[in-house]
Amino acid sequence: MFERIVDGRTDLVFEFLAQGHPANSADDDGVSLIKWCAYYGDVSAIRFLLANGESLESLGENLGLNGAAFHGHWRLCQFLIESGADVNRPLLDTGETPLHAAVCKANRPTYSLVLKVLLANGANPNCVTKASAETSAFMRDARTKAETPLHRAAAFGTEEAIQLLLDAGAKLDAKDMNGDSPLSWASWHLRPDSILRKLCYGGFAIHPGRQATFDHGVGWGALEASLLGTPHV
């Protein structure tokens, strides 16, 4: 039965404990039931384990809030915050906060809900990571760049996610370790003009006639549309 829980049937924790297994049971790799339930965002299963003797601290640093944000589990984020997790606590090795963790995936609407929960509970939109610290947020051979959450949202987030950060006071002119702004990150990642416009600051602007819709290289860009020409028939 544990294998089925590992594969997503976290509802089976009720039956698993009813069979006499302890709430702090773990698989052969030492990953506990509560961590699997957190991985899948099952707050009800977590509450059941807690009621039967498991400890929320076993989820790790800051009650695992960064992980919950990274996986897009807004309900779990809210529960962990209500249980004492700190929305502004950075990871010791990278300086990444839960806000940073919530803007690591491209165009996933669920992360806007996570941002809403974090920001509503006082998350600082202008916190920065450490410089050149190896991060697992992007899985392979990646290092932080002293960036804000808006930098990451500019590269990967939806328009809504970007607007949420801006409304919370995120700085358009924030610079990372290389002197790049969120607009720089959006430009490098080939974001659409609608996003670039949101991120313009100072003397930067996007021509009102530009309506490039490509995102991360997918779709039509302004140059490609222009190169089509206009047939005179």
Briefly describe each language-model feature range.
Residues 3-8, 36-42, 67-73, 101-111, ...:
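Ankyrin repeat A-helix N-terminal signature
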Residues 1-32, 36:
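N-terminal segments that cap or nucleate solenoid repeat domains
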Residues 92, 108, 115, 124, ...:
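Solenoidal tandem-repeat scaffolds enriched in leucines and small polar residues
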Residues 12, 60-64, 110:
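Structural recognition of alpha-solenoid helical scaffolds
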Residues 14-22, 47-55, 78-86, 116-124, ...:
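Ankyrin repeat domain, specifically the short helix-to-loop turn at the C-terminus of the second helix
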